[in-house]
Amino acid sequence: MKQVDTITVTELHEMASKMYGNLVKVDVDVAKETVIVDMEMHADGEAYLLENGSKQEDLWGINLHPDNFGSDDFIEFDSMINLKPRQGNTSRDVLDTDIHAKIVEIVNRVVTQ
């Protein structure tokens, strides 16, 4: 697990091959625009971010599929840490369109070819 400011698709492929084969788990702090990659569970990255000053309501889990870079299937919004009933997010997806868009914006800035 590591915090990244930028990461290449090649690095994501390497991470995916060592853990899940076709995906890399990622946590995003939408307020601080912090990105944590390469953990076994989203909860691991969530714990790290909370220990380092992030707020629970700002943390969202996604999966990146390096083989699908450049397509709509690159980012998968599916994580247990996304279940936030008090924020109206009753799904493993990210239902708030503004938060969803912010995550896409952050990922598009951080991940390079």
Language-model features, listed with the residues they occupy:
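Well-ordered alpha/beta subsegment
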Residues: 92-113
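Generic structural hydrophobic/aromatic packing signal, biased to beta-strands
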Residues: 23-30, 75-77, 103, 107
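Amphipathic, interaction-prone secondary-structure segments
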Residues: 40-74
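Short histidine-centered catalytic/ligand-binding loop motif
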Residues: 8-16, 85-96
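Intrinsically disordered, low-complexity regulatory segments enriched in Ser/Thr/Pro
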Residues: 66-94
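Negatively charged, low-complexity tracts enriched in Asp/Glu with abundant Ser/Thr
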Residues: 5-48
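Conserved, charge-rich beta-strand/loop surface module that forms ligand/interface-binding patches
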Residues: 1-8, 80-84
